[in-house]
Design a protein with these regions (language model features):
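N-terminal amphipathic alpha-helix/helix-capping segment at the start of soluble metabolic enzymes
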Residues: 1-20, 131-140, 197, 203-204, ...
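Active-site mouth loops of central-metabolism enzymes
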Residues: 12-26, 68-69, 73, 143-155, ...
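Conserved, mostly hydrophobic/aromatic
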Residues: 19, 32, 43, 91, ...
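Glycine-rich, proline-tolerant flexible connector loops at the mouths of alpha/beta enzymes
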Residues: 28-56, 173-189
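Alpha-helix-loop-beta-strand connector modules within alpha/beta enzyme cores
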Residues: 51-85, 107-114, 136-140, 187-210
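Conserved anion-binding
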Residues: 78, 88-164, 178
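Glycine-rich phosphate-binding active-site loops on the catalytic face of alpha/beta enzymes
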Residues: 90-104, 169-180, 217-241
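C-terminal alpha-helical cap/extension of soluble enzyme domains
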Residues: 117-130, 142, 148-155, 186, ...
Length: 248
């Protein structure tokens, strides 16, 4: 049995639109799989989701065309190993500020000698040992995206982008705004200017500019600047807007 290809990684330089899922609901994840989005991100950084919640959502999404990204709570060797063994192929690593931190994240996702990922002979990722080529092909199918969320990370952007195994950069305006002194104001002109500058520098570094999370207005602003991986909104705001739009 052949190991699955990472379709999201194959299409990384085409514009893909998706949603952040923070409610830990397999039913909602399965519902979203049929709505035409390119990807769904299962979040464990800003949600109470644990490993069992992630696996349940991966099960619900299996067999659907939608791609799945998982965000670990932190760039941690054990967390990353467990998510990859559970079957995640694309990870969004939060709060990466230096090239060394990016290199560490990549190493956690790769088997020796390229990295330090522990080897399981019967993980869900290898279809419980039935994928004979999983260990041989896993490293090339793993997609590592890193979040640029602070002025320090922005200043190190080119060095982070140059780390082998970093497949894309995420500019997160909410944390960037907070770290710039504009907590809760990702629309501030200084924050938007920093995002535009970051996108330009990504292109200079030959990295595909990637998503930013936030309101639709800000996402559209970003996508017009050739983002390749766009998050038009999170699932929670979508549901909130739907609920508030219903007649009373």
């Amino acid at each position: 049995m052949a190991a699955p290809r990472n379709v999201f990684k194959d299409r990384l330089r085409s514009q893909q639109i998706g949603l952040f899922a923070t409610l830990n609901s397999p039913a909602l994840a399965e519902l979203l799989a049929g709505t035409g989005f390119d990807w769904i991100l299962i979040d464990t950084e800003h949600s109470p989701g644990e490993m069992g919640d992630v696996v349940a959502q991966l099960h619900a999404l299996q067999g659907h065309e939608i791609s799945v990204i998982v965000r670990p709570a932190w760039s941690d060797m054990v967390l990353i190993k467990r998510l990859l063994d559970a079957g995640a192929q694309s990870l969004l690593i939060p709060n990466v500020q230096t090239a060394q931190e990016a290199a560490s994240a990549v190493s956690y996702a790769r088997y020796p000698p390229a990295g330090v990922r522990g080897v399981s002979g019967g993980s869900r990722a290898s279809q419980y040992g039935q994928s004979a080529d999983y260990l041989r092909t896993a490293d090339e199918q793993i997609c590592i995206l890193v979040q640029i969320e602070t002025p320090l990370a922005v200043s190190n952007l080119e060095a982070i982008a140059a780390v082998p195994g970093v497949d894309g950069l995420f500019i997160g305006p909410n944390d960037l705004a907070a770290s710039m002194g504009y907590l809760g104001d990702a629309q501030h002109p200084a924050v938007q200017a920093a995002v535009v500058e970051g996108f330009a520098r990504m292109r200079g570094a030959k990295q595909a500019p990637i998503l930013t999370q936030g309101r639709i207005k800000f996402a559209a602003f970003k996508l017009r600047r050739t983002a390749r991986f766009g998050d038009l909104n999170g699932l929670l705001p979508v549901l909130d807007n739907m609920a508030h739009s219903q007649p009373r």
